[in-house]
Design a protein with these regions (language model features):
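Glycine/charge-rich, flexible interdomain linkers and switch-proximal surface loops
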Residues: 108-124, 186, 190, 197, ...
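Conserved amphipathic alpha-helical "coupling/scaffold" segments
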Residues: 1-86, 189-192, 196-210, 217
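Intracellular alpha-helical coupling/juxtamembrane segments of multi-pass membrane proteins
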Residues: 93, 171-206
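Extended, Lys/Arg-enriched charged tracts that mediate electrostatic binding to polyanionic substrates
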Residues: 83-132
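SMC-family hinge/dimerization module
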Residues: 115-116, 120-154, 161
Length: 220
């Protein structure tokens, strides 16, 4: 069971929890739901009835969290229409920039030290022979230790790079809006989730004892 001792107070106070922290809440709710299903076993019910009376599994909250956050801890595209649209635009812009860079690799092959698209300061650059740097319009981001290579971001892709940075900033804002919404939902149920965790610990211990008793042939 995940440790929610940090996440729940943050959400209860109106703060924003991270995607992985919110996923841990969903995992805990799922564990409670599965355990509740096990309790339907008639042989276990007498022992667990008193404990389970206060168990709320919050299935709607679990479903909402699972819908918005992928198993990897990434906010899902479907979490909000703006986020999904922004990611489509980002993917399209990256593909367009990649195509242009590959075209430039072919066009300026004679000027390059190698045919690899490198990265400097988060921007794509071509490794240009220092003596030929003036023949490739663009922004110089770096040079090799020997000075024989200059890393240039071609002018042809700079506007796309700027557009990508803008879109990525908007993507982060859209992700934050989703996390804020989900954190608010968790915050509203923080007392119930805390109680649920305590009940889970009791049930887990009780079920373990029951299974052990059955294994050794104990008779109650």
């Amino acid at each position: 069971m995940a440790d929610l001792s940090r996440t729940l107070p943050i959400c209860a106070k109106g703060g924003v929890a991270g995607a992985e922290e919110l996923l841990a809440v969903a995992t805990t709710l799922a564990a409670a739901r599965r355990l509740r299903r096990q309790i339907d076993d008639p042989e276990l019910r007498p022992m667990t009835t008193a404990v389970v009376e206060g168990l709320r599994t919050l299935p709607e909250l679990e479903q909402r969290l699972r819908f918005c956050i992928e198993d990897t801890g990434r906010v899902a595209d479907r979490a909000s229409p703006p986020l999904g649209q922004l990611r489509q635009q980002i993917a399209a812009a990256r593909a367009e920039r990649r195509d242009r860079l590959n075209e430039l690799l072919r066009r300026y092959a004679a000027l390059l030290q190698d045919s690899v698209i490198a990265e400097r300061n988060g921007r794509p650059v071509l490794a240009v022979k220092a003596g030929a740097a003036s023949q490739l319009p663009g922004l110089v981001h770096d040079s090799s230790a020997s000075g024989s290579t200059v890393f240039i971001e071609p002018q042809a892709v700079i506007p796309l790079g700027n557009r990508l940075r803008q879109l990525e900033g908007e993507e982060r804002e859209a992700e934050l809006a989703v996390l804020l919404e989900l954190s608010g939902l968790v915050g509203q149920e923080a007392p119930a989730i805390e109680q649920l965790q305590q009940i889970l610990l009791q049930l887990d211990f009780g079920l373990a004892r029951a299974r052990y008793g059955a294994w050794i042939g104990a008779v109650r």
